[in-house]
């Protein structure tokens, strides 16, 4: 079975980004069309190794596209009940960047709009 990288691997890969397209995508789209969408809505390179998330119109389906060294990989999940809860999205935004932990929470059914973060030290990048 092929699976996404483990969350612990994602957390250690500080250069990996997780992008969520804010508008629903046609779930019939596959590798090439999703790669085009990833580039147009995020402005990021689909070959970068970052994760690009696309949800279906009903909110119960999610596709994650990423480049895996020698080709695209696509992960697809359909919920039997409920919907994926999205984070707060600014009006007009075409995509939003998530932390790997937020992706894990979203996949576990946690409503990202109601999550409260405690203040933590973050080293500023040069």
Predicted regions and their residues:
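Polybasic/polar functional segments that serve as interface/processing modules
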Residues: 1-126
């Amino acid at each position: 079975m092929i699976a996404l990288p483990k969350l612990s691997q994602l957390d250690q890969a500080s250069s990996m980004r997780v992008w969520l397209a804010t508008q629903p995508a046609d779930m019939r789209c596959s590798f090439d069309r999703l790669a085009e969408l990833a580039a147009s809505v995020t402005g990021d390179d689909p070959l970068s190794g970052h994760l690009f998330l696309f949800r279906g119109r009903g909110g119960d389906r999610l596709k994650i596209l990423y480049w895996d060294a020698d080709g695209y990989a696509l992960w697809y999940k359909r919920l039997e009940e409920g919907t994926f809860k999205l984070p707060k999205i600014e009006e007009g935004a075409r995509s939003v960047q998530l932390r790997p932990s937020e992706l894990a929470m979203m996949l576990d059914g946690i409503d990202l709009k109601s999550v409260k973060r405690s203040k933590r030290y973050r080293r500023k990048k040069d």
